[in-house]
Amino acid sequence: PTERISASLDTNSVYTMLAPNCLHVRRNAGSVTSSIGASNTGFSPKSMFLIFIALILSRKGSEILLYPEKTLPLHRNITITEMSYTIKDFEIMAPVGSRESLAAALHAGADSIYFGIESLNMRARSASTFTIDDLREIAKICDEHGVKSYLTINTIIYDEDIALMRKIVDAAKEAGISAVIAADVAVMAYCNEVGQEVHLSTQLNISNAEALKFYSRFADVVVLARELNLKQVRKIYDAIQEQQIKGPMGELVRIEMFCHGALCMAVSGKCYLSLNELNASANRGACMQVCRRAYTVKDKESDIELEVDNQYIMSPKDLKTIHFMDEMIEAGVRVFKIEGRARGPEYVRTVVECYKEAIQSYIDGTFSDEKVANWDERLKTVFNRGFWNGYYLGQRLGEWSKNYGSEATERKVYAGRGIKYFSNIGVAEFLIEASEIKVGDKLLITGPTTGAMYVTLDEARVELKTVDVVKKGVHVSFKVPDRIRPSDRLYRMVPAEELKAKRKE
């Protein structure tokens, strides 16, 4: 009954029979699924295999005339039905470490956002702009946009933290936060006690179906361990379906995985390098990124320096999965989490937009190499340390970055601040305070409400006259695609190579 017979007949279709109980056909990278269960039809495994062959040759709406064994009726008609995904079946979760990033996530079409407050989250040092007093406003803004809000309480919790943890959970519940992301059983248990939905962090390192089944008593969504490959993820997904593993809300547990962003050298966490070197615990949200530095390796006995191919021997490249999003979906991933709460709003907007487009293309059946190439180029423009596939496709060893900091192909250079928006003509006025701008420049506008807005400067006006170059100290007006606010920040986007060349001069 558990034997799996699979045949890959072409590059666009995968046909699988789970003999003798169930049969699945997936076409066009998973956008279509046909299923027949033997228990519902009464056919033997042999007959089910004939159905399997017939399905291969069939199209939606067609009927198969079957002639099973003599012990069964002479024939049966089975209509082929197809199941297609909708955008609501998936969730793009955006990282939010500032009000600018929150606005950028909402404008980019994120389905959910995650953020931290106070000291009990894994970005307490690098992205701690929110406090407990902000919870109600964040929940309200997200609700108005139809976006779910998730609060991270995912550090190691000590006895002295229990009172603060409960205070934060109570405040989240009262504010209407959608869920708490937790890694400690104390947090999970208290969330369940007060009726606050909880999701499980990758810090738990859940890597098998039995562990997921155990934790399902607490949570409806589980982030699996980052070191799993997609075959392992699929086995866990199949177990959820077959065993009907449900969370406290009564729904099948959903699988969440990181799809983009920085990877820790310790994979799913529990790193003590920063604590050992600088007394700053990564597991308490205070990682000092010691692993990102360049190192030389010496033999302690002889003091001979060993030759290594890369000085950044503990700094992984960033994860990027957009080119195999179809495989992620086929493995059962339903919530796609983007790392980057310490990143700027332009990063959040660009990454969310690309992955949202990728999922929509998968659903539409228009996912293509050309689109992937376009997304890749756009993703390269924002913060990254170079990209690799992570461990999802079976790679056993990591890939290491070649530089300290970002390898983004574009860098932002501060130019000025917003003064006024003329809504009747869609024009914004800015005061140029630093770097000059010129016609043809790619500009970035950021702000707590504006988020991140890109615009190409096609025409610039100074005192109503068109100009090609706008110098420091000058008020300039130009068309923008949306409203800007006073004190929004204006940047000029510069190719990274151009900026490096100027610094060498």
Spans of model-derived segments:
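Surface-exposed amphipathic alpha-helical tracts and adjacent flexible/coil segments at the periphery
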Residues: 83-108, 112-124, 136-139, 143-155, ...
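Glycine/small-residue-rich interface belts in oligomeric ring/scaffold proteins
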Residues: 130-134
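Well-ordered mid-protein domain cores that form the structural environment of catalytic cofactors
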Residues: 165-201
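Short, glycine/polar-rich helix-capping loops at beta-to-alpha or helix-loop-helix junctions
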Residues: 207-212
